[in-house]
Each structure stands twice: as C-alpha cells, then as structure tokens.
C-alpha cells in the first residue's frame, strides 16, 4: 500500500483508468473514505454476480477481477497478498475445474509472460500485506504492470499500465527490479502444467501446527453469571447449557499464527476441491448412485447445482492438526453447527478471562455471516426453521442475528406445527405470511428419509403436500417446494456426504490435506488402520476406529448402522492435556470464516463433546 497521500490522489473508489481487457482500476485512498458511506464492513466486499473478487479496492481484488474477466479463472481467497505465491491452482469459474498454477522465483530461467501474476513479499512499502500485480506487457528491458493500491491518481488517457519495472537478463535468468528500494519481488505465477524451473509448494514446519494447553489464573472469573442472561441469545445458550462452556473454563488451548494461516489456506483450497468433486458426481450417474440419495431427487439436485452453486452460506470442516500435518476428516456442508459457541460464547469467555495479546479466531464470524447474507440473493423475509431441541434455539438465534445485521426480516419456526396451507395450497406460517425463503438447522437427509417412506412408483414427482385433513406439514412439504428458496441449497448434501471422500481421493491422490478413503478396506487401509463411517452419519455416531493390528480402538453407537460405510485412513486426534482435540473451521460464502476446537476424553468427537477455548498467539 502506498505511504501517505498527495494532492493528486483521487478519492476512494474513483476510476483511475483501465488495464488490458477493459478491467477498471480504482483508487484505494482509504484516507478519503466517508465513514457514513462505508460504516458496514460488508460494503467493502467486491462481487461480480455471485463471484467474490475481494476487498475494495485492494491489490488482491484487482488481480482476481482481472483473471476473472479476461480468463474466466480465479485464485482462492487469501489473507494477505504475499500468500498467493504459495497457491498452486486456479479455479475455472464456469465448471469448477481446477487448473495448475506454477510459481517461478525472481531470477528464474523461466521468463515472465503477459497475464502472469507478479507477487511481492511482505516488508517495506508492502509491510505485513505483500503485494500482487498483473504483468500486462514485456516492453524491451521493461515489464509493464497493472495494479491497485499503489497509485491513487488517474492514469494518462489510453495508458493501460500503472508502473514499469526494469528487467535484467543475465546468464539466461530473468530478474525484475521494483521502483521501491525497500521491497522484495518473490516472483511470477503462470497457469501451466509445465513445472520446469517452478518452485514446489511450501510446507509448514510441523512444530508450528502443534496445539498447546494453557491456563488462566483462577480469580473466580467464571464462578458467577459471567454470561449476560438479559441478552436473548446468551440466555438461550444458558437455558441449554448453563453458565458452562467445558469441564474447566480456566483451561484453554493455543495455536500459532502460522497454524491459523495454514488452516485458512487449507479451508479455502479444500472448499474448492469439494466443489470440483461435487461437479464430477452430478455429471455421472454411477458416482451419484454411491450417495444413496432417492433417485426421484436427482434432477432437482442437478438443477440446484446449476442454479445455486454460489448460494451456500456456511459449513464446517473437521480436521486433525498436529506435528504430523493437517488432515481433513469431513465437510459438514449441509447443516453445520458450533457457530454460537465459537463466535459469541468463546468471545465472551475471552473478554471475561483472557488478558494476553492473542485472539479468538472466530471473533469475526457473525460479521462474516452477515456479509455472506447480504450477497446471498435471499428474499427479504427469511423463515428460520429449527427442530425443538433446546440447543437449536441459540443456533437459530445466532443466525437470526446475522440476518438482521444484513438487513433481513425473520421469523423463527420451532418445529412444523405452526405451518399450514392457504386456500390455494400455498405454504403459510401462523401469521398467514407466505413461506418462500428458509434457513434450516435440519439436515437434508431428514427430508430424504420422508421420501424413502414412499415408493417412487406411487407418484409422478416428489410427494409434496399442498393440503392435509389434519393440516400436517412435513419437512419435505417445505424444503422441496419449488418456490421455497432453501439455505443451505439442496446440492450441499453431496459435499456433506462422506461418499464424496473416496471420490476426492481419486481426484487428488496423496494430497497433503486428504486421507486415503475407499468404499472397501483396501490393502493400504489394512496397513494404516482405518475408521469406519456411515456415509450420512452425524455427530460422531456409528464410527469404529480399527488399528493396523485389527484392534478396535474406539466405537460409537447411533441410528446410522444401516447406512453404507466408507473406510478412511486411521489418523487419530492428538491428545493434549488429557483431551483428544479436533480443529474445526467455518466456511462462510465459500471462504474461511473462523476456527474452533472440540475436545473429548475419547478418540471420537460426538455431539456432547466440549467446545474448548482457543487463542491464536501473536508473535
């Protein structure tokens, strides 16, 4: 970012000129911002249709927008511009194909090319953030680049570049020199399968991924009513759990900033990998059959994917993280939970007891959710559907708060008793309001069970009621009505079903974040040991952990015993201060939104497992 401002600087958001392809370059002079116009963080989000470009009008936003408009590809979201240099793929936006991206160091025998990304390390002019630009032209011994957040004054008419950098060619190697004397150019990135002279993807040192235990000094901070029961949301949590977060509120866990950065990178990358696999599944009947979804729903699934693939609000990935690395267990893409605990209750815990310089890595979760809702295409009134489980009360209220922050009207429906039909067969709530947009806590699989109770041959289509003698509305009568916009969309059952895990492994074999998974116990799984998991199981139910000696290490019961199983490479959770610890990250709008921890004295995390306080320790 440019230091200071000059009299020639244009106000924030002013069009400064154009890069090749007619891609606009905007002023990012934040000192000129009108606080009233930009009082909400969501206003800074830049979108083209449903595709998130970045934060207005930073360098990353421009680079992603340039690639999107000119080549139809984007790179995954990053926290800082310098982190782009560690990415190794681009996503093709029309079909979610993943394309290889290679990084070449400054001074490489591989020449830079027009259209390549140029990446700076953090430091100097680009302190903390680093920088990214687009190489637009090689002009003799100069390279012309286009960028945002360096200059803030209009370009000369017709000029489609912001700066010229000197290029030195010596002994067959290409070195670019910046116009600033205190910066470091890492290199350039080219979309190609050719890996000659490219850098391998950097790997984080194992010790930086270690989860550590810590303690607060016990001054009685949590002896009384430390949660505010006058706040309806906190009160709903207290009604379900009391003034309690875990067995010992003075104990907490810490991770490094490097570990959080790795979680951000992994979450964003895995989300795109899951989307890529979902696209493959929905194009292949043989793959889709592996998910045991009623065949009568297949056309609706494909329509949902075609029309609403960018409408997912939030999900949760479950990881194992320790010195061995980072491995994903599964993606709860359909009906994830733990948002309230991570984004509110543990934030109150930190305010009440933690005095260090670290932070709760889910502190901004509700703001992220509000931002996602603002760009969701949801209708102005959203019905929030939950079952009558007391824990669902605060989960529903947390999402309601995010919706209100985003400007939506809402009504929470506890169970289905309030719903009915008007004279025309339209679905209405107890106040006579039409139900046409819902966010649900129910899993889609619950609705599928209602369909399985009816033979496909009895009906020409999904058996949705538009009336009933006892006014009995079922879940499928709401979620599968064509005019009802449901969040999360129907297609999210595919990434949320564990049948996708063997498909992911086949598409990305030996990927550093994946575990070998199959529909049978193959030879490799016999060697490593394996976890047996029902494909649509939830809450850690019906899981067996089997060692390479065929010894059962842990076993849980539940209601999913009749389901098809997958077999996943055994990768046990680390035991830290007496508990097995699982890392969970939230996706919001397809990008990382925060982290929390679950802890249990057994190897399998279950519904009743604790949420553990987590602090990211700053250097």
Curated annotation (Swiss-Prot):
Positions with a binding annotation for glutathione: 316, 335, 392, 446
Keyword Nucleotide-binding: yes
Outcome of swapping residue 338 to A: 10-fold decrease in GSH affinity, 5-fold decrease in spermidine activity, but no effect on synthetase activity
Family under the similarity heading: In the C-terminal section; belongs to the glutathionylspermidine synthase preATP-grasp family.
Pfam families registered for this protein in UniProt: CHAP, GSP_synth
Noted pH dependence of activity: Optimum pH is around 6.8 for Gsp synthetase activity.
Lineage, highest ranks first: Bacteria, Pseudomonadati, Pseudomonadota, Gammaproteobacteria, Enterobacterales
GO biological process, one term: spermidine metabolic process
Site (Increases nucleophilicity of active site Cys): 131
Organism name: Escherichia coli (strain K12)
Region (Gsp amidase): 2-195
Gene: gss
Domain text: The two activities reside in distinct domains (N-terminal amidase and C-terminal synthetase). The two domains expressed independently are folded and functional; liberation of the amidase domain from the synthetase domain highly activates the amidase activity.
Positions contributing to glutathionylspermidine binding: 58, 64, 78-81, 149
Positions with a binding annotation for Mg(2+) 1: 318, 330
Subunit structure comment from the entry: Homodimer.
GO molecular function: ATP binding; glutathionylspermidine amidase activity; glutathionylspermidine synthase activity; metal ion binding
A cellular-component GO term for this protein: cytosol
Residues annotated for spermidine binding in this entry: 391, 610
UniProt name for this protein: Bifunctional glutathionylspermidine synthetase/amidase
Cross-referenced Gene3D superfamilies: 3.30.1490.330, endopeptidase domain like (from Nostoc punctiforme)
Binding site for Mg(2+) 2: 330, 332
